[in-house]
Amino acid sequence: MNMRRIDPSKLELEERLVTVNRVAKVVKGGRRFRFAALVVVGDKNGHVGFGTGKAQEVPEAIRKAVEDAKKNLIEVPMVGTTIPHEIIGRFGAGNILLKPASEGTGVIAGGPVRAVLELAGVSDILSKSLGSNTPINMIRATVQGLSELKRAEDVAKLRGKSVEELLG
């Protein structure tokens, strides 16, 4: 997993709002409401990130979430229009199975997972949500899975072999 930071100012990022949730703090005088926003950003070219923001007004919560998402960008290794290999992303009780698909398949994913994959630029993939279906857990599991993907060239280099030797 590559841990170098990605500069968001050099990318043309697109934002997608996944959820806005009204949360309440119960105080002596009643309930105090705030809004929690969950946003995914990506350049549709191998970079994606997600963020959360909380504020008393919805637009402010979204703005904070976008700022947070830009700080958490990851690079997604791709082979053509899909991912290099199958992987299961895990976070909390949420598991996401991501499988490479042949060209023309499209993005087969539900809700929050679809937002992450489309903004990452993956256009052919099969996915299945297993366990928790909470949007934040689904997104975290997807991003965790995508961040652990490796290209055949990288694995071959780590093992000191050629790609041909590796693939048989």
Curated annotation (Swiss-Prot):
Record remark on domains: The N-terminal domain interacts with the head of the 30S subunit; the C-terminal domain interacts with the body and contacts protein S4. The interaction surface between S4 and S5 is involved in control of translational fidelity.
Protein name per its UniProtKB record: Small ribosomal subunit protein uS5
Family stated for the protein in its record: Belongs to the universal ribosomal protein uS5 family.
PANTHER family tied to this protein: MITOCHONDRIAL RIBOSOMAL PROTEIN S5
Species per Swiss-Prot/TrEMBL record: Bacillus licheniformis (strain ATCC 14580 / DSM 13 / JCM 2505 / CCUG 7422 / NBRC 12200 / NCIMB 9375 / NCTC 10341 / NRRL NRS-1264 / Gibson 46)
HAMAP family, A to Z: Ribosomal_uS5_B (MF_01307_B)
Domain S5 DRBM positions: 13-76
Described function: With S4 and S12 plays an important role in translational accuracy. Located at the back of the 30S subunit body where it stabilizes the conformation of the head with respect to the body.
Single GO BP term: translation
Keywords noted in UniProt: Ribonucleoprotein, Ribosomal protein, RNA-binding, rRNA-binding
